[in-house]
Amino acid sequence: MWGEPLAAGRARRDPGLGPLDLHVGVSVAIGDDVGHLHDLDRPNRALYIGGMGARDRNFYNDLARRFGYPEAAGTIQDLYLAGRKAEAEAAVPADLL
């Protein structure tokens, strides 16, 4: 999933910058009510999938599509860009959280 984009970026990277460092961020939530825990992360995912970048140039929307969620990614983006953020959040599938 990440190999080709990273290789393409490294090929364009100025060698004077030194080696490329990667940072991975994750969400962690502990509790018995998994649905509630999912709901805590929905606003963040909806923002990234729906609102980060232009409609035709959103890395996170493209990533959700490559993960196998093209319909959900389209719905989330349509709702988010229409200002219907709560509906966009509700449209994030649990498997994407």
Kindly give the residue locations of the regions a language model identified.
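Active-site-adjacent structural elements that line small-molecule/cofactor binding pockets in enzymes
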Residues: M1-L97
